[in-house]
């Protein structure tokens, strides 16, 4: 009986002992998971998968073998917790028994993949704009190419051009893209075209560009500056007579955000400006005082940051949001920058849909064809002239400039100068023509600009003047009038009065000098007269 009892106890231990070890193994893993989770640094979570941790009873295994398996599992989990893993948010302990053998996830399943991104751009990473010649809106192959270069896609373009912008640290991006038959260029930074200067009203200057005598050289003399003749004439005596206001024309401005104003809005929904450039451009375009197109609608593509800079990729993305206006429309760029085939292609596409595109030539005193978007064949590229209709020292020049307009001495209450202001003035004058001819083609617009511009004294470039448009069958110009008299009569009167005053002062001075000299001579005669001999 003793031996029978020992056999029964051994059998029970064989059955219940294995189960106990199995249960303890799972419980031990749970405890280890909780303890390890407390010791883990923030951001690392150890999670138990119930379905994977339920082990089937290994009926053919001995207790020693089961104990060995338990130690192996614990060792494996501890190693994975203690090993540093950057960028990993979860570590899953995977243990599974298949029949008599244990199949556990190897270390490769717990290693972070190469595609995991931390969200930061490394110092060696560069950003690019990738496009293809055929505009079909399909970017799938381009995205696959970017992924093969270990890059991350930032933007996709499907409306004006087909392309993507991406960043990659791959050292051979240009060659890989060329082999794929696509066009790639590095992302660039574009800046607003502005400088600083003290300036009066630009319309007043435009009015005197062609005058022979009463030109801006005449009004710029020191006497007129001291007496503030120009300010008196523009503020108190002058009135701008116009017959068209650009009504029904939609103007889109790519620039910094603008402050709240009637007839204008930021497409991003922002209500305040953080840079004065956008406000000045808006004032020149649709301002009730300083703009030609006083009744045009202005929408601002406010993709330019507060520093006056915008990346090429963000600018192209902003142009994707350019909506159909249902009427004549003008796109005005407030920025210029390095030559970009991608930007030029996008601008050409926009122009082909009937939108008039006006851009600044740039402020680098360089060849204009080296800059975009002004080098695009479909853009009206505008340079800057000074108050004497001479090309500004900062303005770009060359064959890619269509015409010039005032870029210095533009507004009385602003210190900004630059070719972007010139572009705004030209765009505002085009809006007047589109009001009367909403379906005008580019040759007609160019003819209108030719009629309302003049060639400089050397005949080498065209300068915009105050527009002349038809009104009830007549061609009348928008001019300044001073109390019903022609404008030049008033300065002529000023000249006569000032000349008379100067002559009067000169005569008074000569007269006083002569009297003083005579008095001095008389005093000398009295002082040195010899005494009279009375005897």
Curated annotation (Swiss-Prot):
S-S bonds: 369-400
Cleaved signal peptide residues: 1-17
Compartments, as annotated in UniProt: Membrane
Say if the entry is tagged with keyword Transmembrane.
yes
Annotated keywords: Disulfide bond, Hydrolase, Membrane, Protease, Serine protease, Signal, Transmembrane, Transmembrane helix
Q: Name one GO biological process term.
A: proteolysis
For this protein, the Enzyme Commission number is 3.4.21.-
| A Pfam family that the UniProt record links to this protein | Peptidase_S8
- Its recorded name reads Putative subtilisin-like proteinase 2
Q: Which organism is it from?
A: Encephalitozoon cuniculi (strain GB-M1) (Microsporidian parasite)
The organism's taxonomic lineage, starting at the top: Eukaryota, Fungi, Fungi incertae sedis, Microsporidia, Unikaryonidae
Q: What is the gene name?
A: SPL2
């Amino acid at each position: 009986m003793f031996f029978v009892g020992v056999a029964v106890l051994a059998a029970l231990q064989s059955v219940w002992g294995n189960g106990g070890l199995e249960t303890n193994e799972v419980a031990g893993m749970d405890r280890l998971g909780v303890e390890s989770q407390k010791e883990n640094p923030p951001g690392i979570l150890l999670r138990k998968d119930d379905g994977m941790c339920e082990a089937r009873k290994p009926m053919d295994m001995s207790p020693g073998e089961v104990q060995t398996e338990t130690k192996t599992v614990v060792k494996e989990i501890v190693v994975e917790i203690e090993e540093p893993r950057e960028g990993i948010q979860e570590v899953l302990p995977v243990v599974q028994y298949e029949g008599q053998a244990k199949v556990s996830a190897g270390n490769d399943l717990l290693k972070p993949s190469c595609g995991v991104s931390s969200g930061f751009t490394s110092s060696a990473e560069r950003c690019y704009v990738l496009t293809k010649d055929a505009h079909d809106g399909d970017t799938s192959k381009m995205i696959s190419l970017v992924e093969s270069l270990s890059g991350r896609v930032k933007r996709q373009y499907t409306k004006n051009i087909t392309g993507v912008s991406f960043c990659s640290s791959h050292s051979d991006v240009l060659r890989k893209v060329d082999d794929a038959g696509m066009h790639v260029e590095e992302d660039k930074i574009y800046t607003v075209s502005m400088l600083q200067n003290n300036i009066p009203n630009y319309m007043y200057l435009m009015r005197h560009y062609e005058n022979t005598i009463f030109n801006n050289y005449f009004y710029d003399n020191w006497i007129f500056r001291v007496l503030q003749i120009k300010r008196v004439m523009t503020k108190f005596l002058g009135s701008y007579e116009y017959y068209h206001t650009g009504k029904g024309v939609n103007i889109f401005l790519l620039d910094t955000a603008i402050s709240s104003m009637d007839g204008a809005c930021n497409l991003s929904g922002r209500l305040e400006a953080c840079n004065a450039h956008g406000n000045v451009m808006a004032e020149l375009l649709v301002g009730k005082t300083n703009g030609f197109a006083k009744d045009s609608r202005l929408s601002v593509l406010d993709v330019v940051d507060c520093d006056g800079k915008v990346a090429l990729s963000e600018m192209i993305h902003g142009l994707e949001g350019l909506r159909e206006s249902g009427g004549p429309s003008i796109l005005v760029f407030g920025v210029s920058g390095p030559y970009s085939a991608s930007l030029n292609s996008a601008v050409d596409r926009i122009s082909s849909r009937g939108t008039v595109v006006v851009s600044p030539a740039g402020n680098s005193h360089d060849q204009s064809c080296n800059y975009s978007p002004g080098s695009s064949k479909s853009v009206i590229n505008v340079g800057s002239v000074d108050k004497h209709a001479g090309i500004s020292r900062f303005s770009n020049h060359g064959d890619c400039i269509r015409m010039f307009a005032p870029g210095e001495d533009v507004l009385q209450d602003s210190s900004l100068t630059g070719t972007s202001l010139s572009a705004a003035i030209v765009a505002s004058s085009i809006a007047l023509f589109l009001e009367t001819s909403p379906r005008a083609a580019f040759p007609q617009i160019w003819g209108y600009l030719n009629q309302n511009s003049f060639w400089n004294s050397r005949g080498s470039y065209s300068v915009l003047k105050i527009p002349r448009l038809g009104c009830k069958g007549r061609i009348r110009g928008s001019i300044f009038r001073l109390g019903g008299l022609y404008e030049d009569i008033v300065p002529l009167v000023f000249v006569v009065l000032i000349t008379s005053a100067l002559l009067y002062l000169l005569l008074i001075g000569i007269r006083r000098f002569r009297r003083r000299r005579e008095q001095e001579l008389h005093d000398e005669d009295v002082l040195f007269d010899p005494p009279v001999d009375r005897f």
